[in-house]
């Protein structure tokens, strides 16, 4: 959206944009880390999670009630505690806030102002981002207009577009746009308030209360009221707010218990050099995170062009980096123009920790909340750590690997319990192998690789694996070596093997392509299909190795491997099989929240006693009947699971439940020992299998050796002449910096230099 505001830019502004791609000196960082032992698994034996309200968190960490706090302190509290002895406050741009507008038309006879695009665009102009950043967050934030901020790698990709948008705080111009749009829609302004068909228009505004979003929400409420709307604020915490917004039909807008606006908050998981997920998540309806949520029977926000552009980025449908960036710009520009999700700020989150903790690796986005920290962290002389958070459990916390793990609080615990095949480098944001090694072969973007004749795909019509048609081709092949998984065991003591990989692949495909299953879990199936359509075949090479063939290409080959990694190998096949039986055969539970609501069954969560018992009962039935999904485990004449294998698996799960009362079983450095929702408490114990592949320090990164700008020295810029700008940088290690000098004259943008420097 490009809006010409009443204030014209008439001065010459020189803007230096410095985006730094760091090559960290990992050897130097590792030399500063001394593992407390050389045993397999994490550095400590016990990892606890406790809930502390954000307002009392500073006192509690000073009183040694916790060692690290995972929820960002309020800015004033962070400043007060920063100089306290024994405390180090880690800063990380890990949180973003946005305003979600409901674009549904609403019931007949009512007018939802946000169903009008011009009204949504006008809301951009009443968001005083500078006030939010400087006053509410006291400088500990940066303003945002798009799904990426100045801390993200792709900000450089969008920099010109953001400048061209000319979006600034301009409530007078916003009111002008609103007056015209609302009048054209048939509304009347009566005594300063908008009415439609003789009734005042009321805006239902869900405002979160746990942090500064309450203040941000009140600021926005006041601005919307100044536009002539009656605003009814509802102040809610995480669980009720999420349920109201993301589990309801947007077209109920204007009825009791619905919503027009919501103050969203997001946690960034890791750095990402070339974004595809965030763009699609925040802009493109096909992925199921725009109003309507792709749930059957709900009104859906639709935008075919955004879906097309987003899927091109997601599926690697471009010829080179330049075209990829062009598509990314076009999609982001259209998303900004639609203004369904309005970005406000990227928060510099203040995360306090005991300064004696060793082994903290700081992701440049997630800070200490990354995959790495709790695997290496310890306090000398202690064998445990306590992590505080604002919640351990909420009404929306759901532990199932198919349609759960949607909240940040559950994920803060869960990420310590499983090992992903591939993850992101904490500094560069590029995919790197973690527990699976891989080899990429590609003929992309325009060539093809012919699939071997013994490659196979799941056939939902015959409920079996079928050979791919003769002459089948794919753009890329990725060979995955899972030996680091298969040499070790699941937490319940059973060996991880190819059956776990194959069942997970089957489960994903059958949920999507089996008509009965896809109707039950409609939202999951609809979102999954565009991704799964790009897979052309699989081939088991040997006991440890799987070939995956996909129609996907990327100029950075590691992204091809990341895309082709269809299974995360997070839970054993017998758990997945029993959940499938419970959900699709017995219909006593559901994987997703919307399906659970539609069929009036539990949204399955394996940490909850009721749900875990339901799954336990199914496992008992499978065990007594000696049930095995033979059609799944018979692959090209290879039988992956025997009767004795299945019996051993079932027995181990039942023993696990008897001991722990839960059914969260995974493969990472920690296993779940206790989980107590009423007490807001979770306890993880170290997993010390002798063949677990990692020991403390193997993936210790420390801090990135970032480059800082010390000075920008330039004379008066002469248009049409060669000009020299001297940028003084400082920093350790090796770094590359791309400096773009942009001159803006009367709103026109002209590029002068784009150079590479080192420091």
Feature names for model-found ranges:
Residues 29-45, 77, 83, 113, ...:
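Surface-exposed, Gly/Pro/Thr- and Asp/Glu-enriched linker/hinge segments
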Residues 32-36, 48-107, 265-269, 275-281, ...:
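Extracellular/periplasmic solute-recognition and catalytic clefts
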Residues 50, 58-64, 110-122, 450-517:
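Aromatic- and charge-enriched surface segment that lines or borders ligand/interaction sites
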Residues 58-62, 66-78, 84, 226-289, ...:
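Periplasmic binding protein-like
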Residues 121, 125, 133-136, 167, ...:
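Extracytoplasmic/peripheral linker and loop segments enriched in polar/acidic and small residues
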Residues 137, 389-473:
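N-terminal lobe/hinge region of extracytoplasmic solute-binding protein
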Residues 143-188, 207-215, 319, 670, ...:
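Structural transition elements
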Residues 278, 282-283, 290, 351-396, ...:
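Long beta-strand-rich cores associated with HINT superfamily self-processing modules
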């Amino acid at each position: 959206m490009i809006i010409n505001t009443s204030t014209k830019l008439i001065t010459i502004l020189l803007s230096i944009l410095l985006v730094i791609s760091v090559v960290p000196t990992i050897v130097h960082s590792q030399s500063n880390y001394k593992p407390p032992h050389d045993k397999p698994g994490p550095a400590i034996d016990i990892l606890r999670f406790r809930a502390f309200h954000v307002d009392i968190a500073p006192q509690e960490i000073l009183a040694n009630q916790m060692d690290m706090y995972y929820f960002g302190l309020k800015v004033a509290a962070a400043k007060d505690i920063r100089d306290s002895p024994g405390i180090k406050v880690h800063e990380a741009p890990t949180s973003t806030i946005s305003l979600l507008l409901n674009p549904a038309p609403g019931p007949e006879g009512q007018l939802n102002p946000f169903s009008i695009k011009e009204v949504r665009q006008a809301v951009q102009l009443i968001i005083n981002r500078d006030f939010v950043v400087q006053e509410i967050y006291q400088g500990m934030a940066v303003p945002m207009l798009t799904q990426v901020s100045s801390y993200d790698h792709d900000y450089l990709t969008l920099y010109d577009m953001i400048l061209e948008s000319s979006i600034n705080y301009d409530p007078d111009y916003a009111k002008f746009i609103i007056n015209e749009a609302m009048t054209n829609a048939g509304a009347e302004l009566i005594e300063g308030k908008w009415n439609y068909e003789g009734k005042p228009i009321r805006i239902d505004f869900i405002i979160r209360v746990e942090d500064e979003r309450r203040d941000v929400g009140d600021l926005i409420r006041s601005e919307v009221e100044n536009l002539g709307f009656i605003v009814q604020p509802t102040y809610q915490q995480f669980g009720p707010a999420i349920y109201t917004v993301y589990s309801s039909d947007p077209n109920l807008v204007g009825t009791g218990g619905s919503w027009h606006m919501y103050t969203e908050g997001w946690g960034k998981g890791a750095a990402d050099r070339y974004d595809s997920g965030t763009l699609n998540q925040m802009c493109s309806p096909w992925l199921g995170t725009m109003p309507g949520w792709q749930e059957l029977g709900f009104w859906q926000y639709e935008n075919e062009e955004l879906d097309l552009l987003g899927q091109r980025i997601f599926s690697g449908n471009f010829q080179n980096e330049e075209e990829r960036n062009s598509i990314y710009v076009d999609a982001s520009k259209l998303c900004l123009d639609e203004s369904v999700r309005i970005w406000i700020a990227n928060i510099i989150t203040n995360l306090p920790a005991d300064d004696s903790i060793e082994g903290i690796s700081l992701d440049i986005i997630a800070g200490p909340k990354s995959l790495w920290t709790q695997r290496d962290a310890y306090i000398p002389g202690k064998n445990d750590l306590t992590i505080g958070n604002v919640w351990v459990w909420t009404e929306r916390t759901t532990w199932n690997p198919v349609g759960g793990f949607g909240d940040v609080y559950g994920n803060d615990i869960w990420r310590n319990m499983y090992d992903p095949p591939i993850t992101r480098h904490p500094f560069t944001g590029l995919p790197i192998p973690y527990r699976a090694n891989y080899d990429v072969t590609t003929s992309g973007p325009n060539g093809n690789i012919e699939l071997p004749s013994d490659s196979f795909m799941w056939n939902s019509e015959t409920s079996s694996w079928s050979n791919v048609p003769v002459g089948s081709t794919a753009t890329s092949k990725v060979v995955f070596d899972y030996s680091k998984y298969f040499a070790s065991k699941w937490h319940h003591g059973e060996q991880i093997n190819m059956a776990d990989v194959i069942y997970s692949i089957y489960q994903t495909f059958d949920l999507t392509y089996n008509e009965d299953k896809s109707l039950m879990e409609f939202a999951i199936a609809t979102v999954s299909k565009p991704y799964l359509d790009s897979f052309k075949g699989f081939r088991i090479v040997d006991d440890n190795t799987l070939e995956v063939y996909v129609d996907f290409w990327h100029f950075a080959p590691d992204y091809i491997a990341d895309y082709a990694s269809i299974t995360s190998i997070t839970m054993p096949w017998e758990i997945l099989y029993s959940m499938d039986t419970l959900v699709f055969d017995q219909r006593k539970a559901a994987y997703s929240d919307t399906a659970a609501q539609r069929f009036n069954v539990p949204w399955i969560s394996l940490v909850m006693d009721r749900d875990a018992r339901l799954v336990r009962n199914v496992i008992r039935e499978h065990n007594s009947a000696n049930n095995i999904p033979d059609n799944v485990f018979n692959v090209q004449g290879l039988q992956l699971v025997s009767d004795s294998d299945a019996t051993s698996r079932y027995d181990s799960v039942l023993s696990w439940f008897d001991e722990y009362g839960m059914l969260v079983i995974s493969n990472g450095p920690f296993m779940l020992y206790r989980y107590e929702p009423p007490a807001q408490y979770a306890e993880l114990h170290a997993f010390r299998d002798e063949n677990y592949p990692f020991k403390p320090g193997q993936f210790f990164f420390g801090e990135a050796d970032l480059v800082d700008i010390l000075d920008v020295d330039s004379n008066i810029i002469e248009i049409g002449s060669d000009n020299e700008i001297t940028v003084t940088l400082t920093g350790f290690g090796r770094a590359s910096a791309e400096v773009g000098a942009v001159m803006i004259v009367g709103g026109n943008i002209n590029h002068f230099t784009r150079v590479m420097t080192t420091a």
